[in-house]
Amino acid sequence: MEEEKLTSEKEIYDITVIGGGPVGLFTAFYAGLRGISVKVIESLSELGGQPAILYPEKVIYDIPAFPAITGADLVDNLIEQLERFKDKTTICLKEEVKTFEKENAIFTITTNKGNHFSKAIIIACGNGAFAPRRLGLDDEERYADHNLFYNVHKLDQFAGKKVVICGGGDSAVDWANALDKIAESVTLVHRRDAFRAHEHSVEVLKTSHVNIMTPYVPLELKGEGDEATSLVIQKVKSEETKELSLDSLIVSFGFSTSNKNLKSWNIDYKRSSINVSPLFETSQTGVFAIGDAAEYEGKIDLIATGFGEAPTAVNQAIKYIYPERDNRVVHSTSLIK
């Protein structure tokens, strides 16, 4: 699968999937399994969504048939699975969908790079675009991506280093526990005494070698050139300060998400989720929504849930596009020889 280069040619795809995260990738695979052409439009520079960007090294335990799998491995497997249908699949990266409109049964999908054309659309963009919450300190941007990080792609890059982590949620605690095994030292800074993480993870943290600094908040970054060398922290409701020497700083304050373009998509939505029927139809005929982007009674936001929704959405889209076809579902064991 190669990234598409937009041309003036109006190539019309059967289904366009908005979102290249795990659910979007599996949707594209299942569409290929049904023998139709599919395009995936992803706003980021790589496929995989949150597991690839936010927690590639973290282990996921609730994916069927995988007792444990990292975010990166899950994404790699989904991309490998999709490779089977690379001749009928087009990937478009770094494209944000602004609007889409239907005329004569064909959707024109407008992105920041141009127009795409499709007979049906499946929205699988999760909670939308996401960006890290920052420290809000002077010189933060100067150190970002040098030795100040908002997510961890590879644990090995911190081996033998003095690491300071800011945050008190699941990610911060998980990174602290994981890095405790390979870093020279790990210091975890949180503004409250209690952590907002799973109880078991907190218990592991308390028995680790991690230096826990609570309740403290970041006050000042110090550095040389493009690298931070220390973080000054201040105790909450106190004038007391401490300066923490560091080789690497991880800011784990979570990420803010935005589905700001929903308003221009001409579909019914509530807050940042799209209202769907039991068949994952939106208020606009020919447009479907699944995964975290979709909202219905009893919805559970899990990757596994989105995987289960994908075949239904694809099959309904095919019925919409080709109502004259025999659309009985056939098992993959009969479709792939």
Swiss-Prot record:
What does the record give as EC number?
1.18.1.2
Annotated residues that bind FAD are located at 42, 50, 55, 97, 130, 292, 333
Pfam families per the record? Answer: Pyr_redox_2
Q: Which reaction does it catalyse?
A: 2 reduced [2Fe-2S]-[ferredoxin] + NADP(+) + H(+) = 2 oxidized [2Fe-2S]-[ferredoxin] + NADPH
Q: Which domain of life is it from?
A: Bacteria
Its quaternary organisation is: Homodimer.
Q: What is this protein called?
A: Ferredoxin--NADP reductase
Source species of the chain: Streptococcus mutans serotype c (strain ATCC 700610 / UA159)
